[in-house]
């Protein structure tokens, strides 16, 4: 047996392994996802169980976790979850590519009234949570019949021919948020029967609505005209689920023409079937004095 080329052979083997374990397009070292789809769902289930049991201390937060509710830094023990008597309905979407999972929970509060809580978790290795982003509506605007019986259509898996790619889904979401600034909708992005709901209140295809007022409108026409909002800044799309046709997006919507110039924290789940938006689930919270939604790391 000859050993004089062993060092070179070992180096070559290491190089080959390095190529195999690298991303040829980016040069980044390959690694398995910190938390897959089932893992992300399990982390969210555990979070919800801990919070409804009044045990926020059992949530596996990372040491430097960022926790916010309605854009404000908070301690978990001080969030609206402490008021939750029971979770009546929930839908959850996970994205192993980004490590994010989001749930919408229609809850019964301690006074018997309905509430709507959106929870986004960013999950790192070992199931540690680095982000907790809560968008919480406990106002009288929440429609119990909607949030306590969330539409199963959102979680339904689409047949392959009705799906868009991740890239196309995110692009659709970005066009929608751009329309909030330009007031020019892309009509082809919407199904003819598309509807938008704010904490359960139907905004589109009704004679009138108590949220935006004005004449009847569609998903597309509701973005047009001369609305008091725009621009939409801090746009993020933490969860994209191509299998279910889901895009979860967040943006800070400015109202520069309104006294005190409030801003709306917009948290939306888009259901996309056959390349068109069929339903939009929104939690829109008007706030004053908020400069940023956070999570800029």
Residue spans of the language-model regions?
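Bacterial N-terminal signal peptides
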Residues: 10-24
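Bacterial N-terminal signal peptides that target proteins for export
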Residues: 1-13
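C-terminal and inter-domain tail/linker signature
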Residues: 27-297
């Amino acid at each position: 047996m000859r050993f004089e080329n062993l060092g070179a052979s070992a180096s070559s083997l290491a190089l080959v392994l390095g190529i195999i374990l690298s991303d040829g397009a980016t040069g980044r070292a390959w690694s398995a996802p910190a938390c897959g789809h089932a893992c992300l769902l399990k982390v969210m289930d555990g979070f919800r169980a801990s919070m409804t049991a009044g045990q926020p201390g059992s949530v596996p937060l990372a040491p430097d976790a960022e926790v916010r509710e309605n854009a404000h830094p908070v301690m978990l023990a001080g969030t609206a979850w402490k008021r939750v008597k029971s979770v009546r309905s929930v839908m959850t979407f996970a994205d192993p590519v980004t490590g994010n999972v989001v749930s919408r929970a229609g809850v019964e509060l301690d006074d018997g009234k309905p509430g709507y809580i959106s929870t986004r978790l960013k999950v790192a290795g070992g199931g540690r949570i680095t982000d907790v982003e809560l968008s919480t509506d406990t106002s009288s605007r929440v429609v119990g019949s909607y949030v306590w019986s969330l539409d199963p259509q959102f979680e339904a898996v689409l047949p392959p021919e009705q799906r868009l790619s991740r890239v196309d889904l995110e692009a659709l979401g970005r066009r929608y948020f751009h329309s909030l600034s330009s007031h020019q909708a892309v009509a082809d992005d919407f199904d003819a029967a598309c509807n938008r709901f704010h904490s359960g209140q139907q905004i589109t295809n009704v004679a009138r609505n108590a949220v935006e007022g004005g004449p009847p409108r569609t998903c597309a026409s509701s973005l047009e005209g001369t609305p008091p909002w725009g621009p939409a800044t801090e746009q993020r799309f933490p969860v994209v689920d191509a299998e279910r046709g889901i895009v979860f997006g967040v943006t800070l919507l400015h109202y520069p023409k309104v006294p005190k110039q409030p801003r709306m924290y917009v948290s939306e789940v888009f259901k996309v079937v056959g390349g068109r938006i069929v339903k939009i689930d929104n939690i829109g919270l008007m706030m004053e004095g908020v400069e940023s939604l956070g999570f800029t790391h």
